[in-house]
Amino acid sequence: MSKRSAKIAATYFLTIIISLVLIGGGGYLVINKYLNKTPDKSGIDDIVIDDGAAQDAEYAPVFGDGRTVLFIYEAEKSQTSTSFLLARFAPADNKAVLVPLQTDIACELDGTANTLYEFYRLGGTSSAKRAVEKFTGLTVDRYLKFTKDSFNTFADFMGNVEYNIPDNLIFQNPSTGESTVIKSGNQILDSNTLRKVMCYPDYSGGEEYRAKVVGNLAAELLNSGSRGILRDSLDSVFTDIINSDIETDITRYDYDEDKPAIEYVLSNTSEPAQLVIPSGSYNENGCYQLDDTFVDALPRWFAME
C-alpha cells in the first residue's frame, strides 16, 4: 500500500472512532438524563383517599332490606314467665324496631280462637309464629327462643342496663322457690335481676304493662350491646349464643348474609333500637285485641313500604 493510501485509511479510521465516541457519549447523556429524571410529584400530597367512602361502598342498604324475627323468652312454663317480642331489622333506616307482644293477644288460627300464649303452649314455636303472622299480617322470617340460661348468656354479653322500677317488686315463685325483692326507682340490672323484672307477675297494669316493661328492657339491652360488645365482637357473640341452649332456625349462612348490614348499622348509630308499643283493647272474652290502626301501620314502622 502506498503512503498516500495508508494516510487516507488512517484518517478515515480515526474519523469513525471520534464519531462513535461523540455520538455514544451524547446518547449516553441523553438516555441517562431521561432515566434519572426526577418525577414531578407536585399535587400528590393534596390527594386524600376517603377510607370511609370506600368502606361504605362495600355495603349500601336499600329500602326493604332486613329480616323480621320473633323472639320468645320462656324462663319457665307459665304465662307470666314467657315473653314475646317481634323485631324488624331495617338497615336502610339504621334501626331495629322492637314490638313487645303481650301473651294474651287474641288470635284465630285454623278455626280456633285463642291467645298467643295458648297457641304457643299447645303448639310450640311454630304455632306461635303462625299466630303472630295471622294477627299482624306480616311474614316472620326467623325465630329465636331463649331459655333462662341462654337469656342470661345473651344479657351478660350485652351488659347491665339502667331502668326505673315503677314499684317495689316482691314475689315468691311457688314453682321454683325463687324470691324477688327489688326496690322501686332507678336500678342497675344484671342478667338475673333483669329476668326477674321481666317475669314479675303482679304489675298493677297487668299483662299489658308487663309487655311494655319487656319492650323497654329489650330496647335498653340492645342499645347497651350496640355501644359495646356487638360493635367490637359480633362474631363471638353470635357463636356463643348459637352454641347455647337457644332454639332457633337462624343459620350461620343467615348470619354471614346479614353481617355486613349489621356492621353498617352499628357503625352509624349506637342506639338502633326503636320501641313501638301496640295499641288495642280487651274484648268480651278478656283477650287483648290489636286495633286495625296499629296493624295497618306496622309495615310502615318496619320500613317495608
What are these regions (language model features)?
Residues 156-236:
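Flexible, polar/acidic helix-loop-strand segments at domain edges
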Residues 122-181:
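Amphipathic, coiled-coil-like alpha-helical scaffolding segments used for oligomerization/assembly
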Residues 51-57, 68-73, 77-78, 93, ...:
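C-terminal solvent-exposed extensions
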Residues 75, 114-122, 135-142, 199-209, ...:
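Second-shell loop/turn segments in exported
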Residues 83-84, 125-133, 148-152, 156, ...:
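Extracytoplasmic/secreted envelope proteins and their assembly/folding machinery
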Residues 64-66, 79-84, 93-101, 127, ...:
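Extracytoplasmic
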Residues 97-123, 167-180:
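Flexible, solvent-exposed short loops/turns enriched in glycine
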Residues 2-94, 199, 262:
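Entry/capping segment at the start of metal-dependent catalytic domains
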